A protein has these predicted regions:
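Phosphate-binding site recognition
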Residues: 1-154
Length: 154
């Protein structure tokens, strides 16, 4: 039996954002070890979701890892084998794929992407405005370095 306790309000908020018409962007941040990733994992358990855990590696290494996750998510050998130098191409491939239900894209430890490439928050803002916002997709940005998350996302 699967048990998930004391996060009903947060789950309802995420579900409400998911059910909105069009796109939704959710920023979830807080101290380490308070259950943010567990909350997200529970929320996406029955959804069509791509979960990416960023690392403290370089921007290029994170982009390559995200490309692999995206290629697996949309089942695209073309994307998997492509030499992708831009985050835009990966996000465009994700939203251009066909889905039975609204896809959810989770970028966990988002602050590491901004740490590896200081321009990443503005790059992501452009991707949101030009690609993601115009589609029916939910994006969750999650992080634990509170000051960095606030400066990068709010």
């Amino acid at each position: 039996m699967h048990v998930f306790v004391d996060r009903q309000q947060e789950m309802e908020t995420l579900q409400s954002e998911y059910e909105r018409n069009g796109s939704a962007l959710v920023v979830l941040y807080g101290r380490r070890r308070v259950g943010k990733t567990t909350l997200i994992s529970e929320f996406i358990r029955d959804k069509n979701a791509l979960f990416f855990l960023a690392s403290e590696e370089s921007e290029a290494q994170n982009r390559a890892a995200f490309k692999e996750k995206a290629a697996e998510f949309i089942d695209s050998e073309l994307l998997r084998n492509a030499d992708v130098k831009s985050w835009d191409v990966i996000f465009k491939a994700i939203v251009d794929a066909k889905y039975d239900s609204k896809p959810v894209i989770v970028l966990d430890e988002f602050q590491y992407l901004g740490k590896a490439e200081p321009a990443f928050p503005s790059i992501f803002q452009r991707i949101w405005e030009e690609i993601l916002k115009k589609q029916s997709v939910m994006v969750i940005l999650c992080g634990s370095l509170i000051s960095m998350m606030e400066s990068q996302t709010l």
